[in-house]
Amino acid sequence: MQRTRELESSVAIDQTEVPRSRFFIMVKKLSRVADIVYIVDTFLIPPLHPLKKQHPKVAKFLKVQLVFDLISLFIFATHQLLLLEDGNFGKHYFKRKTKRCSKFSCSRCNANAHHPKWFKFKHSLLCLGTFCFGVYSLVKINKFFKTDQTVDLNRLLELFFWQLNAILNMKLFAFYGDHLESHSAPLDVYEDSFANKSSSGGDEV
């Protein structure tokens, strides 16, 4: 009886959900691409204004860069307006679900259960270190042509090194942050989740 009530409630929730239009889905996908383009253009490409005097052709690239930025901002604004119209703007930004590890047996969860303070300290330190190195790389990229306007193969390889370093450190920051969030839940949370899984499995059998 309880199982049928849960199914009825889930069906009722599904009926209240409004199906997404094709235009909304297309704008959502374009918004993700536009975000990547804007982030790369803003943070990973150094300001090219100091090169205008020595390299006049840079002005054309700056115009193209401005067009891409405007298109990205337009797509981003359109996506936000669609979220407001759909009523999911706050849910999209402020109601993010907490990540939890779904593995029945996990070495990281066991490490957190036995040494919770050390687990949180280690992952917090890794997050802080990767974040600081990533920000330092972004600062070096931002000042790359401001301090020296030389453009040659060695300088471009140096720029590529800082760009790669920034990407890797930010990826590692997100990786360790996800591990810190998903594996640092209290032990009773996992016990409750496993109990719910086993009880639901028993009902199905």
Curated annotation (Swiss-Prot):
One Gene Ontology CC term in the entry: peroxisome
Residue intervals passing through the bilayer: 64-84, 125-145
UniProt entry keywords in alphabetical sequence: Membrane, Transmembrane, Transmembrane helix
Extracellular side: 85-124
Keyword Membrane in record: yes
Subcellular location: Membrane
Cytoplasmic topological domain residue ranges: 1-63, 146-205
InterPro entries tied to this protein: DUF4668 (IPR031427)
The name this protein goes by in its record: Uncharacterized membrane protein YIL089W
Pfam families cross-referenced by the UniProt entry: DUF4668
Protein's membrane topology: Multi-pass membrane protein
